[in-house]
Amino acid sequence: MTGRKLNSMEGEVYYPSSEVIAQANIQNWEITAESARTDLQGFWAERAEELDWFQKWDKVLDESNKPFYKWFTGAKVNIVHNCIDRHLKTWRKNKLALIWESEDGKEQRTFSYFALNREVNRFANIIKAMGINKGDRVTIYLPRIPEIVFAMLACAKIGAIHSVIFAGFSTDALQGRIDDSESKLLITADGSWIYGKIFE
């Protein structure tokens, strides 16, 4: 980080190089947007084919109970499988999956897909050992550290529903969100480093 405040960067536009554009998944956003406008279901069905599904969908979009739309009805998918698991038996196994840098830029931690998988599985096993099952709600109240990613992915892996609460919120605000969501578990830390200050 350069130490510049984000609000001082408002209005600045960064254009990717031609090399980056050539390797992008979307070459021309205008054509892509028009495709989505003219054939919404076909567009999203094509995008969905990029993921691994445990069970394919019966219908891309169920509009029978507007405005309560249902996407990919009948399908089964796990986002962790698509984010991590499917890469473990490929050349990506030892490629970078997560790069974390501390707020002050003095510390950096990196995780390959293999290492990220190990951390997520460790978290998932701890959560399961604490009695959390599919459909249970988990509140995550962590500072901006890699463990927040591990916790979110661990919840998704076992089918638990997670709610991330900003680490700068007060205990009253946290309690209200825990009560409202009927959370069974709180994942937290003993302190946070936010905007150059330690909060405990």
Regions found by a protein language model. Name each.
Residues 1-111, 115-118, 122-125:
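N-lobe entry segment of adenylate-forming
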Residues 80, 98-153, 170, 174-175, ...:
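Conserved AMP-binding/adenylate-forming core of the ANL superfamily
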Residues 49, 128, 156:
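Short polybasic/polar patches that bind polyanions
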Residues 157-200:
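Structural core segment of the AMP-binding/adenylate-forming
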Residues 89-91, 127-132, 176-184:
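Glycine-rich phosphate/diphosphate-binding loops that line cofactor/substrate pockets in enzymes
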